[in-house]
Amino acid sequence: TYLAVTESGRRYILQKINSNTFRDVAGLMENITAVTEFLRTKTDDPRGVLTLVKTHDSASYLHAQDAYWRTYDFVEDSICLQLPETDEDFYQSAVGFGTFQQLLTDFPAAKLHETIPNFHNTPDRYRALLETLERDPMHRAAQVRLEIEFALARQAEMAAIQNALAAGELPLRVTHNDTKLNNVLLDAKTRRALCVIDLDTVMPGSSLYDGDSIRFGAATAAEDEKDLSKMEMSLERFRVFTRGYVRACPGLTAGLELLPMGAKTMTMECGVRF
């Protein structure tokens, strides 16, 4: 990702698209174009949604020398935090993601491309784990026996969201799928949420996938912290995020009681994956 500054002082974000992870670049950019153009009709704030800069051929990206590139307008007077400095920062990230959900409530989610198939299909992640355990290619499974037993004991519970989606008990929605604090831009002066960024993983799914925000933001240590005595879940941060998210997304009624399950499932899914 580059900051490009023109002679006139106009600033842009130039990004190389990760075509190794996202093989269908055209589908990915169709998703981003459709979602950002839809959001543009719902807000009067030019900083309230990312703005793609089209090529001279009116395309949303450029393919050159075996690489794919895209450009956004730079969102001026904004900041991006890696970790919340205050509870209000975390609250505002919840407002950002909740607003994103609310504004896209009537977007036809089924029309979106699945840029990473089965990304938050937790039962499928368990299937991959079981296959790997059976092969045990590095002969390390015995070293983490207790952790494996912990995960497998909760396998049925962790299928709740996917089962509810399949049964039609939860609505299919536009989901961001990477709802970390650093994917919400805040106003540099007021610290209020402006817009959601990093839209590569926007796909159809359940709003409960936003529970990944809790896994990341309510943790008392970095996700790669090796000293596990430092790692807990802050219930206060959980309350702060839930309050901001629900207030920003009053249309989120179906599955409201499953919000805590979203946080549990996304946390377990991460553990099963890695």
Regions found by a protein language model. Give the residues of each.
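Conserved ATP phosphate-binding architecture of protein kinases
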Residues: 1-7
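ATP-binding pocket architecture of kinase catalytic cores
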Residues: 10-31, 37-111
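Hydrophobic "anchor" residues on beta-strands that sit immediately upstream
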Residues: 11, 69, 172-174, 194-196, ...
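ATP-dependent phospho-/nucleotidyl transfer catalytic cores
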Residues: 15-26, 75-95, 106-176, 181-195, ...
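Alpha-helical transmembrane segments of bacterial inner-membrane membrane proteins
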Residues: 53-57, 113, 124, 238-242
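Catalytic activation segment of kinase domains across protein kinase-like and atypical kinase folds
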Residues: 182-221
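Active-site activation/catalytic loop segments of kinase-like enzymes and analogous catalytic loops
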Residues: 208-250, 266-274
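All-alpha amphipathic helical-bundle segments outside canonical DNA-binding/catalytic cores
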Residues: 253-266
